[in-house]
């Protein structure tokens, strides 16, 4: 698409960053001075009843800056990148038609990628193939199936944990149905995003600072009642660690503590480590991301001014 046709498209803003980088705080500040509406791009914030461990914006923050695509699923339900793209496009169209600018804020980079580039059509689920995979898993174990995926699609195998049966099963299913790997199919993009997108990435200048922020926030979550939140989910009786919701960082480790598998101190240690690993994966995405302007989260005033310098002109 040439520059002239791009300029005729409606505007949108991406504010991306690793966990605990200050994305939400900056987005709320920007909403005070720009004609924007916020859309959450976070695979954990979609779940109802999961507020503390996901660092969901609190009531005062949401009153000042409402976020769309929060609390749209029960923790028992799945939500895919394709679901997100559909929902985000609908919200963006609604915001744009009201004369405002969509500001998409979050750290689920797969969602940003799906929205920006589109998704290739994947084969629909096949109950017979899925049943055969599950039977194999029952006989051989998911570790053996992960090894099978490693031979078929090493790129997907590196991204999917052996203890993630839902995604592991889907990757194998796609290959058995189509004869093509999940990696091969997802590299074929669908429809690109029909917006002129201004992209920003916010993070601390050093990894050590990010690690400090992560550890501090995890302890703040514990002090705010995170254990009670997860115990309430545990008490429902219908949730388990194969669900994407309970595999969210922090929740998986607290769940293991509640089940008596690990000590409290081990839960804290593992929770902080898992969050750091998540941030590392997010930063890897961002370093390879084209077209983003970097902002320093340790200097929020300067970050705000830098966004306004770029976005102020499009908002007039």
Swiss-Prot record:
This is tRNA dimethylallyltransferase. The record marks 108, 130 as: Interaction with substrate tRNA. Gene3D superfamilies: 1.10.20.140, P-loop containing nucleotide triphosphate hydrolases. It catalyses: adenosine(37) in tRNA + dimethylallyl diphosphate = N(6)-dimethylallyladenosine(37) in tRNA + diphosphate. ATP binds at residues 17-24. GO terms for biological process: tRNA modification. InterPro entries: Dimethylallyltransferase, IPT, P-loop_NTPase. Disulfide bonds: none annotated. GO terms for molecular function: ATP binding; tRNA dimethylallyltransferase activity. Belongs to the IPP transferase family. Substrate binds at residues 19-24. Keywords: ATP-binding, Magnesium, Nucleotide-binding, Transferase, tRNA processing. Monomer. Its EC number is 2.5.1.75. It holds the Pfam family IPPT. Residues 42-45, 166-170, 247-252 are annotated as: Interaction with substrate tRNA. Its cofactor is Mg(2+). Catalyzes the transfer of a dimethylallyl group onto the adenine at position 37 in tRNAs that read codons beginning with uridine, leading to the formation of N6-(dimethylallyl)adenosine (i(6)A). It is an enzyme of class 2 (transferase). It comes from the Bacteria.
């Amino acid at each position: 698409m040439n520059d002239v046709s791009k300029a005729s498209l409606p505007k949108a803003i991406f504010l991306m960053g690793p966990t605990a980088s200050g994305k939400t705080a900056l987005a709320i500040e920007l909403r005070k001075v720009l004609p924007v509406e916020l859309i959450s791009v976070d695979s954990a914030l979609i779940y109802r009843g999961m507020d503390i461990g996901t660092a969901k914006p609190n009531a005062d923050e949401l009153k000042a800056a409402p976020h769309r695509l929060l609390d749209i699923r029960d923790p028992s339900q799945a939500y895919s990148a394709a679901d997100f793209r559909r929902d985000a496009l609908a919200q963006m169209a609604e915001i744009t038609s009201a004369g405002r600018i969509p500001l998409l804020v979050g750290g689920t980079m797969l969602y940003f990628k799906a929205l920006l580039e589109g998704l290739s059509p994947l084969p629909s689920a096949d109950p017979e193939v899925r049943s055969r995979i599950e039977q194999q898993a029952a006989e051989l174990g998911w570790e053996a199936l992960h090894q099978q995926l490693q031979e078929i699609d090493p790129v997907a195998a590196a991204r999917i944990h052996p203890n993630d049966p839902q995604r592991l099963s889907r990757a194998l299913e796609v290959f058995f149905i189509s004869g093509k790997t999940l990696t091969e199919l997802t590299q074929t993009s669908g429809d690109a995003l029909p917006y002129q997108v201004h992209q920003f990435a916010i993070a601390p200048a050093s990894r050590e600072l990010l690690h400090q922020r992560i550890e501090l926030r995890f302890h703040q979550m514990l002090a705010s009642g995170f254990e009670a939140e997860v115990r309430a989910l545990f008490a429902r009786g219908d949730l388990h660690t194969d669900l994407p919701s309970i595999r969210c960082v922090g929740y998986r480790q607290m769940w293991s503590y509640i089940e008596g598998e690990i000590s409290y101190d081990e839960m804290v240690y593992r929770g902080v480590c898992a969050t750091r690993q998540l941030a590392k994966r997010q930063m890897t995405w961002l370093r390879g991301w084209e077209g983003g302007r970097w902002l320093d989260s340790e200097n929020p005033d300067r970050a705000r001014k830098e966004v306004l310098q770029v976005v102020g002109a499009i908002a007039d």
